[in-house]
């Protein structure tokens, strides 16, 4: 979009986001959304990257805020062009999915979910519910494909 008065060009670039697939002995953590968009659906800990953050820094912050867990990134699962929300108000995003593990002491980590979520559960890949967002569904498909 170009400003008709000054000629400045505004580019509709996607916002960078991150999602964490926290692996605990083959089960992965999902959070039930407690706010819109897609309230009541399952999704992964994650969110928007803040200015000056790297992807691993952003996912560590988001996981700590949403679950109280300290994590470390194991690998990148994939990078997906997607949207946050539905319909005309959907925001284009560039979503990086990380496979992570708990780094708190013995790895058990005590969950302390934020008000953003109403529930947290660990699911094996075979029983994992349909994630709320397209990028999460793509990451789940890749995890299932490469898990054996």
Language model: regions and residue ranges:
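Conserved Nudix-box catalytic region and its N-terminal flanking loop in Nudix hydrolases
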Residues: 23-65
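Acidic, metal-coordinating catalytic segment for phosphate/diphosphate chemistry
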Residues: 1-19
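A generic structural micro-feature
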Residues: 12-14, 41, 88-94, 112-117
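Nudix hydrolase/Nudix homology domain
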Residues: 107-148
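A short coil-to-beta-strand element that immediately follows conserved catalytic motifs
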Residues: 70-79
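Conserved hydrophobic "DFG−1" position in protein kinase catalytic cores
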Residues: 22-23, 30, 100-102, 122
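A structural signal for short, well-ordered beta-strand segments
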Residues: 20, 76, 98-100
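Active-site-adjacent beta-strand/loop module that shapes the phosphate/pyrophosphate-binding cleft
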Residues: 80-109
């Amino acid at each position: 979009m170009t400003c008709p008065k000054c000629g400045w060009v505004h580019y509709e670039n996607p916002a960078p986001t991150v999602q964490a697939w926290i692996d605990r002995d083959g089960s992965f953590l999902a959070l039930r959304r407690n706010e819109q968009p897609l309230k009541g659906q399952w999704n992964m800990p994650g969110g928007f990257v803040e200015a000056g953050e790297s992807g691993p820094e952003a996912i560590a912050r988001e996981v700590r805020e949403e679950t109280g867990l300290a994590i470390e990134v194991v690998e990148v699962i994939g990078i997906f062009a997607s949207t946050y929300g539905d319909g005309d108000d959907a925001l284009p995003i560039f979503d990086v999915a990380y496979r992570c593990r708990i780094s708190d002491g013995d790895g058990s980590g005590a969950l302390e979910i934020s008000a953003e979520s109403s529930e947290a559960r660990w699911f094996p890949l075979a029983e994992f519910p349909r994630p709320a967002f397209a990028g999460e569904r793509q990451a789940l498909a890749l995890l299932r494909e490469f898990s054996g």
